[in-house]
Amino acid sequence: MTKIAIVGGGPAGVMAGIVAMQNTKNKPNKLVEITIFDKSEPLKTLLCTGGGRCNLSYAESDYKKLVQFFPRGEKFLLSPFSKFGFKDAQEFFLKLGIKTYIQDDNRIFPISNDANDVRCCLLREAEKLGIKFKKVEISGVEKSTGEFSIYDVENNVYKFDKLIIATGGNRLRSKFSGYSLAKSLGHSITDLKPALCGLITIEDWCKKLSGVSLKNIFGKIIFNNKKIISLYGDLLFTHTGISGPLAYKTSSYSAYIDFNLNNPLILEINFMGKAFDDFDKEFLLKINENKKKKILSVLSEYFSKSMARILLDDLGLNSEDLAGNMIKNDRKKLVKFLTECHLHISSISKEGEIVTAGGVELSEIDNKTMKSKIVDGLYFCGEVTDVDGLTGGFNLQNCWTSGYIVGISI
């Protein structure tokens, strides 16, 4: 009998347990006992994914393109994703009774749009397979004489032949984490940074737009006059700055950039999705066609009236002036703002952290098996490794994939 411990009852850990147990059903001579340890209810974190709808994955069948959605771990994931991609995840869940559908933006959700349905189906399968769950907080681990000794916070000790660490990220700032367990066993941990979080802006006009959302906005990250990357996504204004997919992507790609109030990160956004010259011609034509209308009314054809007023006020332009009276310099000023608007980011909104950048050093893990190169019998899966994806189902796909790889390898 091989006894396997999984520390972490999130998507990756439960996936690893299910696949490992399913794998033994085809091997009568291989007897396995699996126990999943977690201080919280299993798969509790799954309930808030995708706004409660559970964004299971992203429909990109080319694994070489899929890995490009991961700011960290791109090369490492090539082998795992070539073995278990989004179609494999869909098939896995279909066998458990969860039908899925693909949105226009390629995000994948269960037909029910209910994360709890996904949670329940995974827990039913785990129970059917005989996987045990133990609600305790693990505080330490040792490896000696071929077995792992796992300690909980009450100093109880559990003996296992193999160990899977699947504790997820650093959002809860727990004293006892998968990082500390991995480190105690000789693994290196890269710098941990918040990722996929909201951003705090210096500009006040953003805060006046709190609650306003815009679709498919193009952006460009700039720091110290150097372009980092171009990106796009929906944008949500908040009482402290910005949130939503565009902000989340920005926070991930700038996770290791040392920006602050005195040396802010710049997110250049293009509200119009057109180059300065192209939109200038369009807006001039619009003005000439509506000379007797107020400039507020003309701009309100592109934005809500309240947003248009806030933008004009910030630029020092009188929203009550007639469009036909707008001078060239003011038009150019407005067009530049709408196509090359610089938002100065002073810091991240830490309470909104969705994933953690950083984790167990990837060079110390075999990406074909997710097995430790340092400690025999030790495996990793999920966000505890130095892998993090953008918003859109990528991080859950990493959980399903890495959990699957561990399950068939252990």
What kind of feature is each model-predicted range?
Residues 162-206:
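Glycine-rich loop(s) and the adjacent beta-strand/alpha-helix scaffold that form part
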Residues 135-136, 309-388:
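A glycine-rich dinucleotide-binding beta-alpha-beta segment and adjacent secondary-structure elements
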Residues 168-181, 185, 386-410:
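A conserved FAD-binding loop/helix module that cradles the flavin
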Residues 134-147:
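A conserved short coil-to-beta-strand element within the FAD-binding core of flavoproteins
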Residues 5, 21-51:
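Glycine-rich FAD pyrophosphate-binding loop
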Residues 39-42, 48, 56, 60-63, ...:
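An anion/pyrophosphate-binding glycine-rich loop and adjacent beta-alpha core
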Residues 39, 44-131, 137, 237:
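Conserved N-terminal/central alpha/beta ligand/cofactor-binding core
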Residues 5-7, 35-37, 138, 157-171, ...:
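Short hydrophobic core segments
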